[in-house]
């Protein structure tokens, strides 16, 4: 039996970021069932940073993460975590009221937010079909996130603090014994006073193993594809383009273009694969909105995004199980919120108040707590 202060189940962005901040305060062991961390969600993300997206809780967590992303600790990564990538939300359905609503809510958080007419939007992304565009919002503060550098930085930090990240360690049995949690894997057994459930789409399954009431987590599939831009088209400096009704998005990606129908199809937690219909839908919508022709995607994939009923993230102790801490329901926001979410989770696990710089963004324990979901 290997002893630790904190056992974290799941080495995706939720478990990695929480373990990173916890590792300064005790021995952390992260148990990951796959051969590599982040296989199901983190490694399949489009990874874009924008404050003007998501629920108020998500926006607060995203804003509170920016300082860490802009100035990570020395040695955390070898190059910047963020690179400029503005976001342009385009109205293709002639819905000026919704465009104005999104502009005003975004500008309250991002003073640099601009409202564009159709000509301005088309000048920024010249392949847009002018007759299909009715206006846009433009957030110049958006950025691409180097997901791998961020994720690996968290995992390295755990190891530097004498923690362990153990892949191919699936939790087979979880028991509460003499005031501690014991987790049995094929490769060995582990014990700690605190068990952090950061298993992504499998969080409810882990709770079931532990005899803890589930959150009602719903995994959802999102499909995406990569395709080449037309010859002679330089798309490097295009913004991330999102349709106002969130029916698709398009963004430059290492000289190629990444597209998605922005689907959120309820599924069981599994090694999700893209559906041909999803990919075809995304291609059709992009071709309808732009002059781009997508002959055949270079690569297609799908990832899992997991939600609870209110769409917010969860960080807090279970009401009915001592020492069982949820870090769950990252939805599509886990990477852009990871710095604040990891630091907040680590504080709450240790029964400490949230750090002042997180509270300054309007975050508090109650808005993260799983108890808000109780009937």
Swiss-Prot record:
Annotated Gene Ontology cellular component terms: cytoplasm
Control of this protein's activity: Inhibited by D-arginine and D-lysine at high concentration.
Catalytic activity entry: D-arginine + A + H2O = 5-guanidino-2-oxopentanoate + AH2 + NH4(+); a D-alpha-amino acid + A + H2O = a 2-oxocarboxylate + AH2 + NH4(+)
Record-annotated membrane-spanning stretches: none
GO molecular function annotations of the record: D-amino-acid dehydrogenase activity; nucleotide binding
Variation of activity with pH: Optimum pH is 8.7.
Signal sequence residues: none
Family: Belongs to the FAD-dependent glycerol-3-phosphate dehydrogenase family.
Additional observations: In vitro, it is essential to include phenazine methosulfate (PMS) or iodonitrotetrazolium chloride (INT) as the artificial electron acceptor in the reaction to ensure DauA remains active with FAD.
Protein's UniProt name: FAD-dependent catabolic D-arginine dehydrogenase DauA
Name of the encoding gene: dauA
